[in-house]
Amino acid sequence: VIGVPGVSITPPKEMGANGNGISNVMRLLPAMLAKIQSGDFDRFGILVDADYAGVNGGFVQRRQEIENILIPAGYARTPNDPLCPFGSRYTHAAQIDIHLGIFPDHASDGMLEDLLAQSVSNGHHSILQTYAQTCIAGLPSILFNQALHAKKAEIQTLLAWQAPPGIDCGIATKNGVFDTTKPHFSNFSKWLLKVYS
């Protein structure tokens, strides 16, 4: 999704759900726990957007929704690692650990695009980001949910202005649109590598 070498992220739709998004993650999670119990996975991580309190969740609600499935299945959240502030680890006496990462930073409301917006590289990419914000603010008609998708519109607009137009986040990261050394992106990358290496 965002180009961390050696890590493959599979959205719910590619796992048999009728779409992506949190509702499909929640529907798939019990089946994934059964696959973990059967030994189908060596490592398992869950990545979701927090979204926003009062709109479609928020960090606290999102973590609670997932823990409402994990904890009754025998998992317990371990203390956070101060060297890797993104993500939580859940242990089980007889199963592999499950790792949970909630965008944008595993503490705040928001989504992947909030992390990306905070990680845009300085220079011409940040100038284009500012211009994208201005364009979105000046739209004569808004057809998207501004409370939920303003950053998504900003990032998609920024990606539409790349060469080639509309590249995905992984290619944009490889092309330097996003600065992987900025704190939120760096913390997320450390978490992915910790979970999957």
What are the residue ranges of the model-derived segments?
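C-terminal accessory helical subdomains adjacent to catalytic cores in phosphodiester-
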Residues: 2-13, 23-197
